[in-house]
Amino acid sequence: MELVLDDRQRAMLREMGVHVWMPQVDAHEAVVAERSAQLKGGGPRLGGTEQSALPARPIVNSAPAVVPLKTEGSSSTQLALHGRDWQALAAAAASCQACGLCAGRKNSTLQAPESPVQCDWLVLGDPPDEDEDRLGQPFADQAGLLLDNMLKAAGAHRGGMARAGAYVSNVVKCRPPNARLPQAAEMEQCAQYLQREIALVQPKLILAMGRFATQLLLQEHPQQAALPLGKQRGTVYRYQGIPVVVTYHPKVLLRASADKAKAWADLCLAMDIVEASLQ
């Protein structure tokens, strides 16, 4: 897609601390045409060495399809979530006791959206923190404000519809007790909720924000999942056939402003994928 920033988007990027550099028009249009052809053709092969003239637009590398998380030797409880609407799904999450995470829960962060419609964006974040647990919603407080600004710069927002819509969720719906890390079996258990969320949202793209969200979506690729998040960036993965782009969690960006430009590049890649899905 051709990235044309209006004054509002530039202001939002300044809010993120990103300095926007745009190439000369002729060069930019040439690269956009080349990238459009690549996306229509499925993108270059994994491990290709071709480089784009636009630094903020990483080349799309297609990885093998990622299937739902499965842990060897797991004995996860199969939840009866198939066919549930948003209200029933949220009620199930609020009363769920399928794993030990419920011991630390004040509120589930899986909430029925006000307008239950299809959204092109699904944003998956790390386990809920204290603010998310207290409010019962993903991406709360300053991290949530930063995410909202990032989405607005991409032309999307929470509660929007279709191309302008973004549904946000956590990799697990309950805050781990005593702020501990979630276990693999707990993430597998909660992945059943994510699979139903995906079925209801029907996203064109999943934006994985943070290392736990990324671990869930890349579990079938242990070599890639074991890499630092910074080395997982710039590649398009797939989860249940849906493109996945990896980037930093907003809480990390608030602490490390130098990574905001990298997050903007990831967002540009995500915008390209959403745009290509509409062609």
Go through each PLM region and give its residues:
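A polyanion-binding, active-site-adjacent surface
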Residues: 2-7, 11-279
